[in-house]
Regions:
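ATP-dependent adenylate-handling active sites, centered on carboxylate activation for C-N bond formation
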Residues: 28-169
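N-terminal segments that mediate ammonia production and transfer
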Residues: 1-34
Length: 169
């Protein structure tokens, strides 16, 4: 009772025994007027800038590589940055489930296994890659701990897999 989650773009201040919620940001939909070339240039600039700003670190960084579009763009951009600044290869990690390669069945949602794209991207970005293999029983056993770690309902096996994956790294 009395516990809530803030909405996106909202902050809260507790002062003088009162809680005040305030909206500080709202996304506005606007008409897109740029042509294809300009759109590509702006998108590339914004993505590269956002990723490179996160690469400044006193310790070596590592990256989750799922083989999907998001992680692949991040890994390739980070790899190019490290190469340009002579910082060496980046470390990438992926998660796999024991016997998934053996029992994989394609679907409309997932027509091919992730490991094919992970391997392709790791080679393309020239990373030091490590695959973490999780046992399905351990993923199930970690469900309760993952709910506690998130402190709110989440994505069931995805959360427990992520918890075990991070522990392994």
């Amino acid at each position: 009772k009395g516990v809530f989650e803030l909405n996106p773009g909202e902050c809260a201040m507790y002062r003088h025994s009162k809680l005040r919620r305030k909206k500080y940001y709202t996304v506005e939909a606007k008409e897109h007027t740029d042509n294809e070339v300009t759109t590509i240039e702006k998108t590339r600039y914004l993505l590269t800038d956002a990723i490179q700003r996160q690469l400044v670190s006193d310790v070596p960084l590592c990256f989750f590589l799922s083989g999907g579009l998001d992680s692949s763009i991040i890994v390739k951009t980070a790899s190019m940055y490290n190469k340009e600044h002579k910082l060496g290869k980046i470390n990438t990690y992926s998660v796999e489930y024991r016997d998934n390669k053996k029992y994989f069945q394609k679907s409309n949602f997932q027509p091919t296994p992730d490991y094919e794209f992970i391997s392709m991207m790791s080679k393309n970005a020239d990373t030091k890659h490590r695959e973490i293999v999780l046992d399905n029983t351990l993923v199930c056993d970690a469900l309760y701990e993952s709910v506690q770690a998130r402190d709110l309902p989440g994505y069931v096996d995805v959360d427990s897999s992520l918890l075990l994956f991070c522990k392994e790294i």
